[in-house]
Amino acid sequence: MLNLYAAKWCIHCKKTEDFLKRNEIEYNYIDIEVQADDIVKKVIDVNGGFDWVVPTLEYKGIWRRGKIFNETELTGDLKKMGVSD
């Protein structure tokens, strides 16, 4: 299942979550503000050492760095990750 690493204050996280719901893509919402340090460190590492870069996505070990919401780009990235057709 797709993992969405996000924060409640992040508008791009909310837009990504709305997109996933609208497209009926199952996901786990992982609030990085309440996670163990090792999980937060992994998200930071995936994002090149930058702190609080969300939304970050992970699917079967394939990571997508946190980005500003762009529906076209997200659709393409999810296809590349194998999440959707």
Task: Describe each PLM feature range.
Residues 5, 31, 66:
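Small/polar loops that bind or transfer phosphate-bearing groups
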Residues 27-29, 63:
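Conserved beta-strand scaffold positions in the cores of enzyme catalytic domains, especially
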Residues 32-51, 78-84:
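Thioredoxin-like thiol-disulfide oxidoreductase module
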Residues 43-68:
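Short, structured active-site "lid" loops
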Residues 59-85:
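Non-catalytic, surface beta->alpha helical segment in thiol-disulfide oxidoreductase systems
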